[in-house]
UniProtKB/Swiss-Prot annotation:
Keywords: Cell membrane, Disulfide bond, G-protein coupled receptor, Glycoprotein, Membrane, Receptor, Transducer, Transmembrane, Transmembrane helix. Disulfide bonds join C103-C181. Lacks the conserved DRYLAIV motif in the second intracellular loop that is required for signaling of functional chemokine receptors. This is C-C chemokine receptor-like 2. The keyword Cell membrane applies. Belongs to the G-protein coupled receptor 1 family. It is found in: Cell membrane. Residues 323-344 are annotated as: Disordered. Residues 65-74, 126-148, 220-238, 303-344 are cytoplasmic.
Length: 344
């Protein structure tokens, strides 16, 4: 009788204990992204915002006032700086209280800036390849600038259309009694919607990583085949390629972490320790990726001698008479810069 009554109780106790252990294991080491986000996001994003806005506004000033917009690459570089500014404008507002409309506006600016930057990086690389392939004669000067304006408009429209799904399905995270525009958690993943979760993650991976990586790799290989007979010409493409490489290097870790986090069931990463590592890696890699907007102006300074010259002129005001240096610089740019594109 005792055995009959104790055995079920023992078995029942074991089952309860196993369930509790399972629940504890499931929740034991879940990484609290809100905690680290509250510590790092406000200070880091504010610093990146200040530095990035100042740097990119300086780039816009140099391009518009000194270098001019009579070359297609300058038009693309200007739009690239504007894309960075759109991205940067969202950073101070992450992890702060805000309603649904405010968060959706931030999401829209964030992804429009990110996608447009990807497109302009690809356009810059493609433009330099076409200039080299056709030795500067594939378009007349009169046709190049309108073509640059049209392709820039198409890139912006495409970036806006690509952002519509994120804008439509985003829901702000609920924390305590307030809504927060969450930076730490992937902002465009709607709750309990597996299809949208997979679709938007794949769209992010393809748009920001796979597509530009394919464009860059293909064009780089094609150009290297021809440049082996004239390595000196390769220096003309350092700036454009450096911008693309830095963009890919800074966004690749986040895209990989996001992909693994979204499809963790397919990679046997659903255990508690893997969830902890994935949540942590998504947040940290995203924080690193947001700093990319501050890097492009540094590349201009280190790799573009003309930009450095205009930058020194802007800060030091070396010219004695304002008109003659302007003519001299204008003639220098019209003689030197178009020659670079035609020599290639």
């Amino acid at each position: 009788m005792a055995n009959y009554t104790l055995a079920p109780e023992d078995e029942y106790d074991v089952l309860i204990e196993g369930e509790l252990e399972s629940d504890e294991a499931e929740q034991c080491d879940r990484y609290d992204t809100w905690a680290l986000s509250a510590q790092l996001v406000p200070s880091l994003c504010s610093a990146v915002f200040v530095v990035g806005v100042l740097d990119n506004l300086l780039v816009v000033l140099i391009l518009v006032k000194y270098k001019g917009l009579k070359r297609v690459e300058n038009i693309y570089l200007l739009n690239l700086a504007v894309s960075n500014l759109c991205f940067l404008l969202t950073l101070p507002f992450w992890a702060h209280a805000g309603g649904d409309p405010m968060c959706k506006i931030l999401i829209g600016l964030y992804f429009v800036g990110l996608y447009s930057e990807t497109f302009f990086n690809c356009l810059l690389t493609l433009q330099r390849y076409l200039v080299f392939l056709h030795k500067g004669n594939f378009f007349s000067v009169r046709r190049r600038v309108p073509c640059g304006i049209v392709t820039s408009a198409v890139a912006w429209v495409t970036a806006i259309l690509a952002t519509v799904p994120e804008f439509a399905v985003y829901k702000p995270q609920m924390e305590d009694p307030k809504y927060k525009c969450a930076f730490s958690r992937t902002p465009f993943l709607p709750a309990d919607e597996t299809f949208w979760k997979h679709f938007l993650t794949l769209k992010m991976n393809v748009s920001v990583l796979v597509f530009p990586l394919f464009i860059f790799t293909f064009l780089y290989v094609q150009m290297r085949k021809t440049l082996r007979f004239g390595e000196q010409r390769y220096s003309l493409f350092k700036l454009v390629f450096a911008i693309m490489v830095v963009f890919l290097l800074m966004w690749a870790p986040y895209n990989i972490a996001l992909f693994l986090s979204t499809f963790k069931e397919h990679f046997s990463l659903s255990d508690c320790k893997s969830n902890y590592n994935l949540d942590k890696s998504v947040l940290i890699t995203k924080l690193i990726a947001t700093t990319h907007c501050c890097v492009n102006p540094l590349l201009y300074v280190f790799l573009d001698g003309t930009f450095r010259k205009y930058l020194c002129r802007f800060f030091h005001r070396r010219s004695n008479t304002p008109r003659q240096p302007r003519r001299r610089f204008a003639q220098g740019t019209s003689r030197e810069e178009p020659d670079r594109s035609t020599e290639v």
